[in-house]
């Protein structure tokens, strides 16, 4: 067992993040972006480091590592430290490999004006890079999983679950420049069975297979049939599937945000240090509490007895209480109830507050 696995992993993100040059030697030969005037080029290595920096900063600023740990406990359960290590390595390095597909020679030629390894230019996928990155990711981590299973460091069940995540994470990478659609659509594309004839996944796999064989004389890990994965999801509890859905959306959001910040830094020269955290809270509260709507609510709270359920149900457009009329009575009552519940749970993590259309959410 590796030294990293001598203890229980708790998402030590910086130690888990891989340098790009440990995965490919082409990071400094290939470019990720051009400046608007075309005079400056950002290498793939530079872009990856920026993305990793922002990914880490967002996780740290939002305390997302606690979510990682909780998900790992709830979804993965009792697994070996080696399996835990591989899972965490796979999760953290979604950002590391998300643009590695830009070593596609046609992307370099058509997008970066870089005539790099033209003899390996793909015929079927043009300059696309996201789906190529997804294949790179799959091959890299499926190989790690297979090796660990072959060495007896992880068992078959752990191998199956880790492979599930390898496919899910590669799917996230494939969609990082677009919306999240059907995972089944992605699997169909990998196997050449996409009903909309979008078999770019299979085409990217075939190109990558040729590229790796020509350069390194190494085979690409064979892709599995996704029926096994779908069967596992069907028989898995709804609760675990909800965890998995939330995990997928979280990693997708983190990747897109980090990529955006990193690209913006290169294009503008501005290094972002604000991740939506509120630092001037006293000024904001003072400004907010002095607007007319909030003054009206505070006056209502001070001078009017709160409605019980029966009274609340009888409020209509002609109801007048104090200087508040109709639907604004309902909005005021809902605001005060929400505020009281929030104050009573001020030390809790609150992720979602639901309110119907027309309830005055903009004032909250």
Region roles according to the model:
Residues 65-79, 145-161:
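Intrinsically disordered, low-complexity domain-flanking/linker segments in eukaryotic proteins
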Residues 123-135, 164-175:
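Elongated alpha-helical scaffolds
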Residues 1-29, 53, 148-319:
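N-terminal accessory nucleic-acid engagement/regulatory domains that precede
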Residues 346-363:
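Walker A/P-loop
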Residues 51, 59, 94-98, 133, ...:
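Conserved structural-core and active-site-/substrate-pathway-adjacent residues in large, well-folded domains
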Residues 44-48, 323-347:
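N-terminal pre-P-loop "Q-motif" helix
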Residues 46-58, 127-143:
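An active-site-proximal "capping" alpha-helix that borders the catalytic cofactor pocket
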Residues 1-123, 305:
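Acidic/His-rich, divalent-metal-binding segments that scaffold phosphate/diphosphate chemistry
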């Amino acid at each position: 067992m590796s030294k990293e696995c001598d203890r229980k992993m708790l998402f030590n993100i910086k130690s888990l993040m891989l340098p790009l040059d440990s995965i490919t030697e082409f990071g400094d030969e290939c470019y990720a972006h051009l400046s608007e005037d075309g005079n400056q080029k950002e290498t793939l290595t530079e872009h990856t480091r920026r993305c990793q920096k922002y990914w880490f900063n967002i996780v740290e600023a939002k305390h997302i590592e606690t979510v990682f740990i909780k998900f790992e406990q709830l979804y993965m359960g009792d697994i070996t430290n080696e399996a835990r290590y591989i899972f965490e390595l796979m999760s953290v390095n979604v950002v590391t490999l998300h643009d590695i597909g830009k070593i596609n020679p046609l992307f370099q030629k058509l997008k970066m004006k870089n005539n790099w390894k033209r003899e390996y230019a793909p015929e079927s996928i043009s300059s696309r890079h996201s789906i190529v990155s997804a294949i790179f990711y799959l091959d890299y981590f499926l190989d790690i999983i297979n090796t660990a299973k072959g060495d007896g460091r992880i068992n078959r069940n752990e191998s199956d679950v880790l492979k599930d995540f390898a496919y899910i994470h590669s799917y996230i990478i494939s969609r990082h420049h677009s919306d999240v659609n059907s995972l089944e659509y992605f699997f169909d594309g990998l196997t050449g069975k996409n009903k909309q004839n979008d078999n770019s996944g299979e085409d990217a796999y075939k190109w990558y297979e040729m590229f790796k064989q020509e350069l390194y004389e190494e085979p690409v890990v064979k892709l599995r049939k996704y029926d096994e994965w779908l069967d596992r999801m069907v028989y898995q509890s709804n609760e675990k599937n909800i965890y998995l859905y939330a995990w997928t959306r979280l990693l997708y959001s983190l990747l897109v945000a980090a990529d955006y910040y990193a690209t913006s830094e290169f294009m503008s020269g501005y290094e972002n240090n604000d991740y939506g955290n509120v630092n001037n809270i006293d000024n904001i509260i003072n400004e907010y509490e002095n607007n007319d709507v909030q003054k009206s609510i505070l006056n209502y709270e001070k001078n009017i007895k709160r409605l019980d359920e029966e009274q609340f149900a009888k409020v209509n457009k002609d109801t007048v209480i104090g200087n508040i009329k109709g639907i604004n009575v309902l909005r005021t009552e809902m605001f005060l109830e929400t505020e009281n519940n929030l104050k009573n749970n001020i030390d809790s993590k609150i992720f979602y507050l639901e309110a119907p259309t027309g309830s005055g959410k903009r004032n909250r």
